[in-house]
Regions:
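Structured catalytic/translocation cores of nucleotide/phosphate-coupled proteins
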Residues: 1, 33-35, 107
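Non-catalytic C-terminal accessory region of glycerolipid acyltransferases
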Residues: 102-218
């Protein structure tokens, strides 16, 4: 399927070093456009179900993704995924996804993320709470990306964090100026407070008129 390249609006310098990139999801649109067109070496961080074989992919897509998050009828979701799951299973095999786990295996996710940065690639995380679906105005950022940034910091990597927002209607990916994790530590705020501030900024990138955002460019 052909996906037209979106416009990239940088509010600062282009991403020229291994970084932590945060983005909204917009269903599959955000991950696909970032994977295909963001001009920097990167790996996506995503749910382990999409990296665990065809049966797992089918179950996740048919129930969690299309039924619970996209609100499809369960029968049609299961029927559609008989075709979609094998194709996406092949796609994800080539994606080099960093699988995220909800249990003790998360340690392997964190270590793989650090290795990715050390190998010169950025890590892309989609921290929004999508349990009730995907929304234009995001309601919550999980703070796990800050745990990852903290692990990086303890291993000597002061990771720059970029907030981005994919504006599907305008086919534009807005990329904010980076913030170093060490600068966040100086604020003496909790992870939840910092995550909330990133959430607010992400929503600003998605809601402000593009001409106003252009005025913020460096």
């Amino acid at each position: 399927m052909f996906i037209k390249k979106p416009e990239h609006l940088y509010l600062g310098d282009k991403i020229d070093q291994p970084s932590l990139i945060l983005s909204n999801h917009v269903g599959a649109s955000g991950p696909l456009n970032i994977e295909l067109y963001l001009d920097t070496p990167l790996r996506l961080w995503g749910t382990y179900e999409m990296n665990s074989g065809l049966k797992s992919v089918y179950k996740y897509l048919s129930y969690t993704y299309f039924h619970k998050k996209k609100h499809w009828n369960l029968f049609w979701s299961k029927l559609f995924c008989l075709i979609a799951a094998p194709l996406l299973n092949l796609f994800y095999k080539g994606l080099r996804l960093i699988p995220s786990y909800p249990d003790g295996r998360l340690r392997s996710t964190l270590n793989l993320g650090v290795e990715t940065l050390q190998n010169g690639e950025s890590v892309v995380i989609f921290p929004e709470d999508s349990s009730n679906g995907y929304f234009t105005t995001l309601t919550k950022f999980y703070s796990g990306f800050l745990l990852f940034a903290d692990v990086c910091h303890k291993k000597g990597v002061d990771v720059p964090i970029y907030v981005t927002y994919f504006r599907k209607k305008e086919k534009t990916l807005v990329i904010d100026k980076p913030v170093l994790y060490s600068d966040l530590l100086k604020q003496n705020k909790s992870r939840d407070e910092i995550a909330s501030e990133f959430l607010q900024r992400c929503n600003q990138l998605g809601s402000m008129p593009l001409h106003e955002l252009t005025q913020q460019t460096a």
